Curated annotation (Swiss-Prot):
Gene3D superfamilies: Jelly Rolls. Glycans are attached at residue 136. It is found in: Secreted, Extracellular space, Apoplast. GO terms for cellular component: apoplast. This is Germin-like protein subfamily 1 member 3. Keywords: Apoplast, Disulfide bond, Glycoprotein, Manganese, Metal-binding, Secreted, Signal. Its main location: secreted. Mn(2+) binds at residues 109, 111, 116, 160. Residues 1-24 form the signal peptide. Belongs to the germin family. It comes from the Eukaryota.
Length: 227
């Protein structure tokens, strides 16, 4: 045992490095649960005030209504109905029902804080995501039928589209109580204030008049940047 201290120190350093590689997108809870309440008379955790644990009931961990179809009479022909469960606060998960009219879709978008898993309940969906430039922007896509499941990694562009002739229903579960949602089209062509059309025209190899048109589609209330 010539260098016992050095060996011990090396183990500590390796343990610290290994711990630094572990990622946690939602903070680990410091208690069994923190049921969110609107009143400001409790303990403040993860952006919400916690209900007194002595007053927590089973209903705080319950939600109904995911059996009710959403209104898909919209431009994109889809509707997302997230389950509103106060007890989800600090638990790092979320769930929603997604309804699609024939031809309806959830456009290319990003969840910056969570991976997502899709379970098809009814209909026929085309789903997919695109890898980063590290993997040459590869498209991973599948056609899903009832009972099929597909996973979307965190932070990558993804989409869901109903390619069937009937309505479709899916359940989406995410690994965060607040996964975030960034629509690619809205972010690029509907930002506030708007991105200069010259920049977008050059970036996407588009005629500047097409950029102006897309700006009106994604943000009809805003004026175009003077060029």
């Amino acid at each position: 045992m010539k260098y016992p201290f050095q060996c011990f120190l090396a183990k500590i350093i390796l343990l610290a490095l290994a711990s630094s590689f572990v990622s946690c997108y939602d903070p680990s809870p410091l208690q069994d649960y923190c049921v969110a309440v609107p009143e400001k008379n409790g303990v403040f955790v993860n952006g919400e005030f916690c209900k007194d644990p002595k007053l927590v009931t089973s209903d705080d961990f319950f939600a109904s209504g995911l059996n009710i179809p959403g209104n898909t009479n919209k431009r994109l022909g889809s509707f997302v109905n997230p389950a509103n469960i106060p007890g989800l606060n600090t638990l790092g998960v979320g769930i929603a029902r997604i309804d699609f009219a024939p031809g309806g879709l959830i456009p290319p978008h990003i969840h910056p804080r969570a991976s997502e898993i899709i379970l098809v309940i009814k209909g026929k969906l085309l789903v997919g995501f695109v890898s980063s430039n590290d993997y040459n922007y590869t498209l991973f896509s599948k056609i899903l039928y009832p009972g099929d499941v597909f996973v979307h990694p965190i932070g990558l562009v993804q989409f869901h589209a109903n390619i069937g002739k009937t309505n479709a229903v899916a359940i989406g579960a995410v690994g965060s109580q607040n996964p975030g949602y960034i629509s690619v089209g809205d972010a690029v062509f509907g930002s506030k204030p708007p991105i200069d059309p010259k920049i977008l025209a050059k970036a996407f190899a588009l005629d500047i008049n097409i950029v102006r048109y897309l700006r009106k589609v994604f943000s009809p209330q805003d004026d175009i940047v003077n060029d």
